[in-house]
Amino acid sequence: NIAEACKGFKNHPTSILNFLEGTRRTSAKQLNQSSDYKNLLKPKIGGIEYVIKDMGDYLHKLIDVTIVYPDGTPTFWQFVKGECRSVKFVVSHYDIPKQVLVDNDIERRSSLSGWIKTIWMQKDQQITEMTQTTNVP
């Protein structure tokens, strides 16, 4: 239960991992989802919304990690076996906006959705720029 976990986190320095795409992106998943993004699936904000609702006053930053495989996305087993020769990471830090920390559920969800959409548009453009000079499909 997210709410129970968040109660325990309030008493300790904590980092919470949340994967907004929910799964690894494939071309088929992207087509099926009718994503607005060239390189990303639509973000799912339900999990992060619960965390912000329960821990908003305790959270200060969102750290976004973008991972790009210049030689093409490996399968899990290729990655584990070391057959992935190159991986690029971009780490971005964002202050959590005050309008995302409001008590009203509707306002919070709307603000959070808009904020994440802005981050996703920047992230999508960043991936496009990173892959223009490589062979990533």
Stretch-by-stretch model annotation:
Residues 1-7:
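A Trp-anchored, charged/polar loop motif used as the substrate-binding/catalytic surface
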Residues 10-103:
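A cross-family acyltransferase "interaction/gating" segment
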Residues 102-137:
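Accessory terminal regions of nucleic-acid processing enzymes
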